[in-house]
Amino acid sequence: ALITTGVDPTSLIQNNYPNYYEASAQLYETFQQWSSSSAIFVGFNNINFDEPFLRQALYQNLLPEIYMTVTNNNVRMDVFDILRLVSVYSPEHIKFNTDDQGYPILKLDEISKLNNISINYDAGPHDAVFDSLITLELNKILNIRCPKIWNSAYEFRHRDTPKRFMLDNLVFTNTTFWGRRPTIKAQTLIGGIPSRNHHYLVYNLLFDPVKIIELEDKDLIKKMNDGAKRIC
């Protein structure tokens, strides 16, 4: 982190920075103010990266409502996920570099330079405010250039939307990423998981479902454990 941000370790001691609890409490207070009348929390890779750290910080410092981004009518969006979908379904609308296998490199600092995204702020990449402002500008660009993808992401900001979508569509596609590599699967809904809200079982239609439906229970369990991703 020190190498990435360029922070001098001595400055952490010499400057009057807040300690871990104080910083967490400040974040908590700010988020509480934002969410007082419902909020959309937007970031860049915030759902899979930033939020787990935030929740852990709030938990460790005995601050309540660690799930505030998805409770009390609050919702969230991830610009990184929108950008990944654009790189698959509408790559002509955004400039990006590729790795040696041809997959998009979607680092925020590179994307901002390639697409001439600039802000009037005296800092650089990996500064929290700088990255937030760049993310905001990138979000605006994606909304303008790729409105269908952006609007879909906006609709899916609600946690109940996936269930409603799957009930309304017998067959649908699901785009997932393994590292930078996208995978598109045709799937159908099996049902929910009683012990886990907002988690669902779907069937991968790459495999013939008739052969699965006809199996005895013991054979079905064996099939589910053979490594093939029939049910996700």
Predicted feature locations:
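Short glycine-rich, polar/acidic loop-and-turn segments at beta strand-coil junctions
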Residues: 16, 45-47, 206
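Glycine-rich, highly charged phosphate/nucleotide-binding loops
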Residues: 15-29
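Generic detection of long, well-ordered alpha-helical segments
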Residues: 17, 21, 48, 129-132, ...
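Acidic two-metal-ion nuclease catalytic site recognized across multiple nuclease folds
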Residues: 141-232
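Metal-dependent phosphoesterase core characteristic of DEDDh/y 3'-5' exonuclease domains
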Residues: 1-12, 31-148, 156
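A short linear-motif detector with a strong N-terminal bias
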Residues: 20-21, 33-34, 54-55, 179-182
